[in-house]
């Protein structure tokens, strides 16, 4: 397994699942919580710009003179063939070798985990102190971890002790003497029992992390995670001088043109340049602009996870020679200082989009205030038309509206008239009651004494004003308005449910799209489309289906309306579909059959959309 100081941290295929899982678990712990590797067979985007940055640890100027030599896109769509978890024997630092195949839809991969059962693994990790790495000291182990990870000690002895044998990531065995002694009594690896030799050989220093695992069969394995200031770049034993700069790009270009497999080396502490397809698409859907707020996760010098917020101050190419590259395309400004260095330019998939809490609270407050106003006006007008205490008149009786004392009385009367005629927030007891009977000039005073008060905009409608100027007939207000702004009083009244539905239709532009078997949802803007053709094309791009939705051999597109009914996309004219659709689902044919059997699926008389029903230039139906 050894090759120029390079060790494969994965066992051969003949090794049982327990040992394989222990290797992967130990490697992942040593790599850190921020390291995310793709899975074999997964679709990814490979960014050569990030690969060069990792290998060369170069500046932007050094990257600039490489790109013009080769005709290579800023990103390559690939599929993962295999992943080898490796460790550098000289430093015990872990890294991964990822095998990629450019632009292929099907790749045969070796399934090294035939059993889906996850073995039980106990582990602990400890940041080493000065006492732990001193020649005269030993490794002190917390009691809880010693009980979980080590065989039980014989407590009947004056000094409980046992000898343990553990293997490192590349299979070398090390012996440690585990004792339980001292005042107070503690579990520890003694310096004379092998720990001192181990610490010296591995060149352990303060801040390194010692990780130990115990499998179901009692096997012990350990790894080392170097302190932040001691972590280096890709080991020179892994990448020879011939593979630097031009060699890396040349090998990728050759693989891209010949459609053959190529390998890339990934170090956990570096920026991720092999990105999952779903993660990339989800990041691009955020539409980051200047001024957008974000949060990014880091690992501190003490290996604790930290999150820092910032603001995007620029969106552009990091290098002029890599046009339209998303690699570090966001120039950022951080809110606060940090004890470690942070990048000034980041990639969209490395950050989390934030919506300012102040904007959320203000938006919700405005919406709440708006609905409160409408509800109050609706309740007042409903009382105005239904209460019998005002003069004990029927609904056919004429009514006058007091004049408003502030200057915008005409505009407010316009609002009131529109509210009465268009929003229909009041209850209508008589179907034959028309708007001409609703609003008439006042011809007589109300003589019946009111028993209750009814306020409209702070004015008591039950009190009879003695001033002639206090009454402004609606007709006079309407005459003062321009001809083109007069309201049509013959417009039919609509129910509150219709009004509410209309208002929601105007505010809903982006709706969620869920695909069966895909964890991450997408969002589409129906207002930016002109027909079903564009919708299907957009969905195929988002989920990488390649005409599978148009042919309808495997998938069907379903949507839910405001009432939760599930219907096939294509049964309704495009404008009606845009108004009704609340969520879109891409389901398999089998799932549609199950929905029909459970009577959960609503089928109108017309058939669903097929590829033949949609001509190439359909725009609105």
From Swiss-Prot:
Gene3D superfamilies associated with the record: 2.30.30.1040, DNA-binding pseudobarrel domain, Phosphatidylinositol 3-kinase Catalytic Subunit, Chain A, domain 1
One GO molecular-function entry: DNA binding
Keywords carried by this UniProt record: Auxin signaling pathway, DNA-binding, Nucleus, Transcription, Transcription regulation
Record-linked InterPro entries: ARF_dom, ARF_plant, AUX/IAA_dom, B3_DNA-bd, DNA-bd_pseudobarrel_sf, PB1-like
Membrane-spanning parts: none
Cellular component per GO, a single term: nucleus
GO biological process entries: auxin-activated signaling pathway; regulation of DNA-templated transcription
SMART domains referenced in this protein's UniProt entry, alphabetically: B3
Keyword Signal: no
PROSITE patterns assigned to the protein according to its UniProt record, in alphabetical order: B3, PB1
PB1 domain boundaries: 508-600
Domain of life the protein comes from: Eukaryota
Pfam families according to UniProt: ARF_AD, AUX_IAA, B3
DNA-binding positions: 124-228
Cellular location(s): Nucleus
Keyword Transcription regulation: yes
Domain notes: Interactions between auxin response factors (ARFs) and Aux/IAA proteins occur through their C-terminal dimerization domains III and IV.
PANTHER family assigned to the protein according to its UniProt record, in alphabetical order: AUXIN RESPONSE FACTOR 12-RELATED, AUXIN RESPONSE FACTOR 4-RELATED
Subunit structure: Homodimers and heterodimers.
Family listed: Belongs to the ARF family.
Function in brief: Auxin response factors (ARFs) are transcriptional factors that bind specifically to the DNA sequence 5'-TGTCTC-3' found in the auxin-responsive promoter elements (AuxREs). Could act as transcriptional activator or repressor. Formation of heterodimers with Aux/IAA proteins may alter their ability to modulate early auxin response genes expression.
Protein name (database record): Auxin response factor 13
Gene (UniProt): ARF13
